[in-house]
């Protein structure tokens, strides 16, 4: 006897039908394949894991935690500039990303792209940017430009282009076309339709995406210093290398407060815009 499974009719009302034996077998095969993959992955992880360190991890964590308390508050004087650098990396990187992302989005959206070739190039830029993590961009740029906040800023910008452009071009494709048609009926040119028909509809999205990405970039820029790309992560890396745990705890607290404030600012600004 086949199992009962839900199905939807054309008018959206949920009905029920029996699952055939073939469908049941296919379902069981999928389950078995999934279980086999999980078991194989667990076996590979187990073979490459030193379980002594895993079992000893709680005591090691407790030991490190005890060394991190209390934080070295006097070290705060050396953190103000790295925090400011982190904010600058995120802010300037986001601005660079938005300057590139907006034209890429208009070139990629189906209703604004000049032709298929331009759209393909736009999609390639978006995918390339989204495929590479900001830490990898930072590593590459540190080798090219040397360590410092310039490498971190450009890394944040390159990583953010794809994220921002994707959200913006999807918003462009979902605009109300009646406004554009009304402007077109007046004999407006292509640029005029873009400026008066499309851009006003997507401006809130552009602003919202920019603020949202800035919030994300604050968090990402805190760790770029681990690869030499400036910011407070550079101080964190130095403290970790010297086992200065009281400094590490203070840096983590500063990062936590910075991220919390950036999220609060982002939420307030986006709430006012959207």
Locate the predicted segments by residue.
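N-terminal, non-cleaved signal-anchor transmembrane helix
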Residues: 1-95, 102, 107, 111, ...
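Cytoplasmic-entry segments and transmembrane alpha-helices of multi-pass inner-membrane transporters
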Residues: 104-138, 167-170
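Membrane-cytosol interface at the C-terminal ends of specific transmembrane alpha-helices
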Residues: 147-213, 264
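Hydrophobic positions within alpha-helical transmembrane segments of bacterial inner-membrane proteins
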Residues: 94-102, 106, 110, 135, ...
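Generic hydrophobic transmembrane alpha-helix motif, especially the helices
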Residues: 126-160
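Loop-to-transmembrane-helix entry motif
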Residues: 23, 72, 86-94, 125, ...
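Alpha-helical membrane-interface segments at transmembrane helix boundaries
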Residues: 80-88, 122-129, 211, 215, ...
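C-terminal transmembrane helix and the adjacent membrane-cytosol boundary/short C-terminal tail
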Residues: 249-274
